[in-house]
């Protein structure tokens, strides 16, 4: 195989090949998203057609289920063109490229990787930094990065329980570790398995450099491809049978931990809004100022997600602008605790663009929904206010 090493790859081609390598397949949905950003002609002609004609990729599947995988020559091509970018031995070409179960997860991974790229989260070679962190060595984290399930299992034998779950990897920021899941309507999480995996994560990072050794700095994010998948995750089906897959029960088990939902079909907030601690606090402050939320007393430990109380009342306020499933489950549990009256109220703070979605989740139980009031603000106006572009939010 003859390859011109010095000729740089275009951004579109480099990204396409990188995702195909790391995810093991690039799905039709990911291709569609790339066409939106780079242009139909660029992806179809300058990327897919050229790589196919040279024998570097091959198409598998049919119709909406199609995807592209690297060939043996394609794998060698990526190693030559980007020699230091990935731990290539970990991402050797799959031997079961037509296995349907494996394909579902690989295709989902490719879409997650593309959204991470859009949000400025790198997914190239960071295994060395992760190893250093786990071993307690100093690690300078300049920008958020993503490390895949495959890399993590190679890094620590304590994390082998990652296999068989909807766990995809972790996002590492300057202050925290965020466990990445991508469940769906057909692939719910097993609460017991995920609880065990969380214990493995906390154990593995117990000797890490501060602040990564603190369990409070380990969080969750759930990537959903459709709103239907997200809505279904709040279904209480199988709630009483611990052997049944139930993402809702997983939410309940992690109720006291910080978590977020990212909608890949059109997320309202940016990933940086939750990864950047200062930005997150700024958004919380805007909602608190606008709706006159009084901060809770330090001694109020009933629920970590109660951020305060509305004006001078005893109405609890929950921040839900990050679509936190643990906060929503906590808010629901709040209405079921002893002493909560039939006329009791709970306020949920969210972005205007997500208000209908949250209301739809709550309306699955009419008796429950009557206890909630949704307080919303437009995302763009909140950002403009934080950036000093407008003096106030109308």
Predicted regions, residues:
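Long, compositionally biased intrinsically disordered regions
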Residues: 180-189, 201-214, 218-394
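Short alpha-helical segments that sit at the start of domains
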Residues: 1-16, 98-103
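Short helix-to-turn junction characteristic of helix-turn-helix DNA-binding domains
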Residues: 19-23
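Exposed, interaction-prone assembly regions rather than primary DNA-binding/catalytic cores
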Residues: 93-199, 203-206
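Accessory beta->alpha helical hairpin/"wing" motif in late/C-terminal subdomains of nucleic-acid enzymes
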Residues: 49, 58-90
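Short acidic, hydrophobic short linear motifs in intrinsically disordered regions
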Residues: 24-35
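Short amphipathic alpha-helical interaction segments
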Residues: 37-53, 59
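Short secondary-structure junctions
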Residues: 57-59, 122-127, 288-298
């Amino acid at each position: 195989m003859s390859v011109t090493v010095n000729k740089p790859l275009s951004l579109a081609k480099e990204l396409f090949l990188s995702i195909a390598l790391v995810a093991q397949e690039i799905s039709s949905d990911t291709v569609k998203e790339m066409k939106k950003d780079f242009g139909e002609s660029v992806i179809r002609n300058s990327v897919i057609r050229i790589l196919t004609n040279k024998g570097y990729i091959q198409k598998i599947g049919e119709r909406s289920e199609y995807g592209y995988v690297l060939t043996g020559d394609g794998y060698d091509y990526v190693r030559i063109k980007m020699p230091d970018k990935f731990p290539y031995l970990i991402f050797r070409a799959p031997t079961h490229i037509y296995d349907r179960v494996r394909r579902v997860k690989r295709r989902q991974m490719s879409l997650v990787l593309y959204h991470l790229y859009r949000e400025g989260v790198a997914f190239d070679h960071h295994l060395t930094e992760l190893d250093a962190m786990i071993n307690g060595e100093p690690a300078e984290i300049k920008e958020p990065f993503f490390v895949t399930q495959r890399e993590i299992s190679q890094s620590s034998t304590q994390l082998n329980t990652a296999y068989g779950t909807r766990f995809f990897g972790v996002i590492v920021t300057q202050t925290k570790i965020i466990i990445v899941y991508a469940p769906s309507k057909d692939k719910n999480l097993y609460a017991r398995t995920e609880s065990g995996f969380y214990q493995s994560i906390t154990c593995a990072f117990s000797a890490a450099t501060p602040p990564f050794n603190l369990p409070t700095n380990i969080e969750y994010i759930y990537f959903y491809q459709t709103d239907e998948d997200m809505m279904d995750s709040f279904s209480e089906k199988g709630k009483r049978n611990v052997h049944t897959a139930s993402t809702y029960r997983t939410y309940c088990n992690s109720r006291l931990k910080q978590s977020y939902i990212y909608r890949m079909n059109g997320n309202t907030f940016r990933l940086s809004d939750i990864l950047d601690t200062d930005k997150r606090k700024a958004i919380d402050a805007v909602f608190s100022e606008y709706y006159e939320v009084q901060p809770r007393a330090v001694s109020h430990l009933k629920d970590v997600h109660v951020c305060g109380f509305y004006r001078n009342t005893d109405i609890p306020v929950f921040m839900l602008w990050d679509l936190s499933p643990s906060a929503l489950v906590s808010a629901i549990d709040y209405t079921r605790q002893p002493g909560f009256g039939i006329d009791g109220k709970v306020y949920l703070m969210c972005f205007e663009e997500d208000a209908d979605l949250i209301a739809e989740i709550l309306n699955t139980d009419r008796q429950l929904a009557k206890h909630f009031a949704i307080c919303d603000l437009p995302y763009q106006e909140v950002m403009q206010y934080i950036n000093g572009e407008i003096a106030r939010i109308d």
